[in-house]
């Protein structure tokens, strides 16, 4: 099982630690990935497209998903679409059904950002897949886990500097994967 979380950038910016060479190397991991989990910045880098911003329509989602599937990913979870309606959307598509079979997963957006949510999402998704959940269900479980972890985190001192405190919600993740 090869799950690829690119961790290359966010908000339209490449992380300072990433070089063009590392971006190209990450692109080689797309081909054959059982599940590729980029945010919109990472998807833009991997497909060689301009960053479209967080508010993209269904046609743009289909274009990006199609390009990532065409690059060889077996399944794609495109994360973090924010259309300004209080929801964060993730989209799941597979090479077997193409973009026509994509699934939209929406979670309530919280009024703050914290670091580490992408890592927590990828880890929770991996755990749910390993527990036998189909990818779309695993992505939904991961999204709910991250949202609940962020809700717990907001009550911790200096939470914006510390990052997501997911440990308080691990019991919930275990319960979600057993349902």
Task: Cite the ranges covered by each PLM segment.
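Phosphate-handling active-site elements
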Residues: 99-104, 128-142
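Charged C-terminal helix
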Residues: 136-179
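Short beta-strand/loop segments at the ligand-binding rim of alpha/beta enzyme cores
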Residues: 1-2
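Short pre-catalytic strand/loop immediately N-terminal to key active-site residues, enriched for Gly-Thr
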Residues: 101-116
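Rossmann-like NAD(P)(H) cofactor-binding subdomain of soluble oxidoreductases
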Residues: 6, 10-18
């Amino acid at each position: 099982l090869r799950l690829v979380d690119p961790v290359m950038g966010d908000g339209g910016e490449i992380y300072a630690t990433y070089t063009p060479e590392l971006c190209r190397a990450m692109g080689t991991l797309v081909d054959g990935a059982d599940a590729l989990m980029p945010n919109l910045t990472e998807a833009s880098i991997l497909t060689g497209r301009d960053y479209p911003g967080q508010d993209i329509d269904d046609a743009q989602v289909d274009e990006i998903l199609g390009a990532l599937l065409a690059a060889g990913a077996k399944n794609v979870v495109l994360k973090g679409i924010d259309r300004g309606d209080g929801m964060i959307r993730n989209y799941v598509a597979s090479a077997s059904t193409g973009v026509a079979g994509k699934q939209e997963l929406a979670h309530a957006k919280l009024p703050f950002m914290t670091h580490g949510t992408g890592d927590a999402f990828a880890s929770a998704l991996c755990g749910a897949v390993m527990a036998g959940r189909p990818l779309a269900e695993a992505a939904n479980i991961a999204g709910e886990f991250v949202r609940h972890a962020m809700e717990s985190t907001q009550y911790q001192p200096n939470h914006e500097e510390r990052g997501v405190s997911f440990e308080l919600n691990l019991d919930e993740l275990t319960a979600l994967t057993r349902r």
